[in-house]
Amino acid sequence: MVLFIISAVLTSYCVLLLLFALFQVALGEPLDLHWLHKILLFFGVVFITFGVVGIGLIWKQEWPIVPLSLQATAPFLQFGAVGALTLLSPFIFRGSKFLIAVAFIAVSAAIFLCPLYIQSPCLIEVHELPEKPKLIGHRGAPMLAPENTMMSFEKSIACGVTAFETDIQLSKDRIPFLMHDNNFPGFLRRTTDIKDKFPEKANSRDSANFTWEELQSLNAGDWFVKVRTDPFHSVSYLSEDDIEAARNQTIPSLLQLLNLAKEHNISVIFDIYSPEKENETDDIVKTILHSGIDRSRVLWLPPTKREHVKKIAPGFTHFYKDSEEKEGNYLNVKYSELNMADIRKHRSSNVTVNIWGVNERWLFSLLWCSGASSVTTNSCHILKDMDRPDWVLVSNKYSCMYISLCFTFFISPSIRTLKTFLLPFINNFLTKLQT
């Protein structure tokens, strides 16, 4: 956090310094940078550069978000870049060095050619806009209530979700329950009070070490409302009643969730941890069948024993994680693993495509324009209120706007040139007429 604050301060300082420099150039004042500013500017550039490189190395898995974000912002970034070029051009060509002028022309050419490479799914006619993707609550509504608790799933119902997404493990006495963290020492410590209730088991890594009675006795909500662990910084927006309800949540069983889903005609999609255990899949299937939920509302995702599940529980809707391995018409992939063109291709082939990890409006907008069937999200309370994507721009209108900007860029220097060379001539001509 400290590094981010330092980076923000240095970035603001560099931007302000650049603005002051532009003002001085515009006023015709000489640029005379104090030695202290030179040192700070050099330090800021080096610090920010190393920071960006470091973040890129640490979060390599997030690099796919860059081209996606450009699809959402490229048309507007290009407009802004053209505006900046228009403002900077008189300063660049006013006695600039040859190399600087050449570099400026090269950058200008790249910016003006950008529209040839901009491919955004939201550059479409309004009447071509696909149906809004359905919402699947990732562990319920984890921004509004503790994840994987009954309160969380009840909150997601208010968002209009069509499915609950959850994670299933088995207790020592073979009761399926809901919990994401798994297979590492202290897997219950993040979301329960295991350290207080069973300190001798606090570092256990296996759900089979706990009976269902022990799991039910754990508090699964108090961690959520504490300032130190508030995962989405959203607790301050909750009512006192919601905070109190969250504080008293417990670990639910799979059967409880299935009964809630059956009551509200909502589907259920889930992962199983750890699916390699003997008979674990069978125990979960038995619980599902015992609940009486409509089998078509069970969106089966785990690849383990899939063929066996198809035999003992026909009627489940099977989702696949890989477009190359899928055998049916249902696909469940992360937002970074399928490009927008592929989504459209699958949808045109009547394949249902669910995209998971979608928590931001801009990403949801892109997927909406691309035709995604549904998204799995933490922020269903935000996405439910969207009546249309953040922006939709008809290609013809974008072309007109682009041509207008180009005209403005090229005509403004011409006007300045005419004023420079013609005004003295006109004034001289008028003076002669008067004499």
Feature roles, as predicted:
Residues 1-435:
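Phosphate-group recognition and catalysis centered on beta-loop-alpha active-site segments
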